[in-house]
Amino acid sequence: MNRPAPVEISYENMRFLITHNPTNATLNKFTEELKKYGVTTLVRVCDATYDKAPVEKEGIHVLDWPFDDGAPPPNQIVDDWLNLLKTKFREEPGCCVAVHCVAGLGRAPVLVALALIECGMKYEDAVQFIRQKRRGAFNSKQLLYLEKYRPKMRLRFRDTNGHCCVQ
């Protein structure tokens, strides 16, 4: 199956890598790709299809937060995701958080869009921003979820330059 290449989404002080899931056969290449982008945490939002031990051996923490394909994330995963980002980007400025689902077109982009929205971006702008790099991202159910999502501005803190930053 031909999968889209990983894409980096950078906004203000946040860096994300959206990617598809590897197999045990492609795990070495996948791990090298993560290291190239400086990934320290990988969030897996689909069922496990590979052994995470080799990834963790390379110093990349793997979190398993699966939710249904095509569906919006449950509230608990949204809370966990935003809390993770708040901590990561404060403690490791410049780090990159990777997130993957099966194809990297639905669940993973939704979580990145939520982070952008929580930082003050309008949902339409967040969708367009991600789709510029990840064509085909989001299905209609996910778009409706993002449209109705009401941010609590959990990632919106201003630094002295007026930039969104995580504190």
Curated annotation (Swiss-Prot):
Q: Which GO terms describe its cellular component?
A: cytoplasm; cytosol; early endosome; nucleus; plasma membrane
Q: How does it assemble?
A: In contrast to PTP4A1 and PTP4A3, does not interact with tubulin. Interacts with RABGGTB.
Q: Which family does it belong to?
A: Belongs to the protein-tyrosine phosphatase family.
Which Pfam families does this UniProt record tie to the protein? Answer: Y_phosphatase
Cysteine methyl ester found at: C164
Instruction: Please report any disulfide bonds recorded for this protein chain, giving both cysteine positions.
Output: C46-C101
UniProt cross-references to SUPFAM superfamilies, sorted A to Z = (Phosphotyrosine protein) phosphatases II (SSF52799)
Q: What is its EC number?
A: 3.1.3.48
Q: Which residues bind phosphate?
A: V102, A103, G104, L105, G106, R107
Lipidation, S-farnesyl cysteine type? C164
Q: Does the keyword Hydrolase apply?
A: yes
Q: What is this protein called?
A: Protein tyrosine phosphatase type IVA 2
- The encoding gene: PTP4A2
Which organs or tissues contain this protein?
Ubiquitously expressed, with highest levels in skeletal muscle, heart and thymus. Overexpressed in prostate tumor tissue.
Tyrosine-protein phosphatase domain location, by residue?
A: 5-158
